[in-house]
């Protein structure tokens, strides 16, 4: 029987940032410390959601909840700020899942990038 040890030191991170990237096809949740070093990164596909089910609010809720519980157990996180980007359907569900994990949420910020009349959009699809 072989036992493998994680070579990365367990750090006690009390304050962190939850990055939620919600697209039309998937949701990606990354939890970092305040300097931006990644602690946990996961997506809806990692929890068994496939195809169009990855973009549902339920998948976003499960993904965010699992990621936050993992980082609380491993690093003892108590306070987070939330940054949400993307136009996906699971934005609010993921925020609610983070708030339900008994963490102190200091701020919720929308970092979705919007063009100020930049590049021309591609034409409509003709089938």
UniProtKB/Swiss-Prot annotation:
Alphabetic keyword roster: Ribonucleoprotein, Ribosomal protein, RNA-binding, rRNA-binding
A GO molecular-function descriptor: structural constituent of ribosome
Record flagged with keyword Signal: no
GO BP annotations listed: translation
InterPro entries referenced in this protein's UniProt entry, alphabetically: Ribosomal_uS11, Ribosomal_uS11_bac-type, Ribosomal_uS11_sf
Cellular component annotations (GO), alphabetically ordered: ribonucleoprotein complex; ribosome
Tagged with keyword Transferase: no
Pfam families: Ribosomal_S11
Coiled coil location: none
Subunit field text: Part of the 30S ribosomal subunit. Interacts with proteins S7 and S18. Binds to IF-3.
Task of the protein: Located on the platform of the 30S subunit, it bridges several disparate RNA helices of the 16S rRNA. Forms part of the Shine-Dalgarno cleft in the 70S ribosome.
PANTHER family, A to Z: 40S RIBOSOMAL PROTEIN S14/30S RIBOSOMAL PROTEIN S11 (PTHR11759)
NCBIfam families (alphabetical): PRK05309.1, uS11_bact
Family: Belongs to the universal ribosomal protein uS11 family.
Protein name: Small ribosomal subunit protein uS11
Species in which this protein is naturally found: Ehrlichia ruminantium (strain Gardel)
